Every structure is written in structure tokens, then in C-alpha cells.
């Protein structure tokens, strides 16, 4: 299964260990899932970690390398304007480019969308229950 994680999933996993988001990343690292990411998502993760969690440049560099090795980095060629929040559109672009089957998010606007071009949009709880019961 190919998946794209929203920025909030990465932030929860990287900044607040021991939660469901970390479990999801560990499953990816174990090879239980193919994950795709774009440079825009990586940049947003790094920006949030720097601003809200006071991570230093060395830590941010390690996170960038980790994410690039954990997931396939894709380059969306088309800009979408489906959701009001621009960073959410970057998630949709990544998922469409990667031909993902699922987007995992905690974002209510994305969850309300439910599906985009055949790509299911699930909460982390529903994703873990369905993929890694």
C-alpha cells in the first residue's frame, strides 16, 4: 500500500514520541508500507519543528535526511487548489503524483473531503486499525 502522511502526522511522531503517529512511522520503517513525501511536505515539517518545537539546525538536518530515506520523494508537477489551506493542497498533490491509495491526516478539512480522485483520506486511528490491526 502506498500512503502519504500529512504534516501533522510527522510532527506528532517526531515531536511527541510514544503516540500513534510514532507507531505509524515505525511500521513504515519496518517495511510494512510504502510512504511518499514531497519537498514541500518536508519543508513544512521542518518549519513547524523549528518554530513550534525550537529544533536546532542540526536536528532539522537529521529529520530531513530521515524523511528522505524513509519515504519516496516525489515531485508534483501540477498545483492543486482543492482545499482552502494551501499546505493541505500540497498533500493532495503529493498523493496524486505518487499514486497513493491513502492519505493519513488529523486535519478536519481533509477528513471531511473523505476521498480525492480515488485516494482515501483517513484519520490516523482508522488507518492503523485498518492496515495494522
Walk through the language-model features, giving the residues of each.
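Active-site neighborhoods of divalent-metal-dependent phosphate/nucleic-acid chemistry enzymes
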Residues: 69-103, 108
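PIN-domain endoribonuclease scaffold, especially VapC-family toxins
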Residues: 26-82
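Short, well-structured N-terminal submotif of metal-dependent ribonuclease cores
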Residues: 1-37
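Hydrophobic/aromatic ligand-binding patch that stacks against planar heteroaromatic rings
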Residues: 27, 94, 113
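Acidic, PIN/NYN-like endoribonuclease modules and their adjacent C-terminal/linker elements
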Residues: 108-133
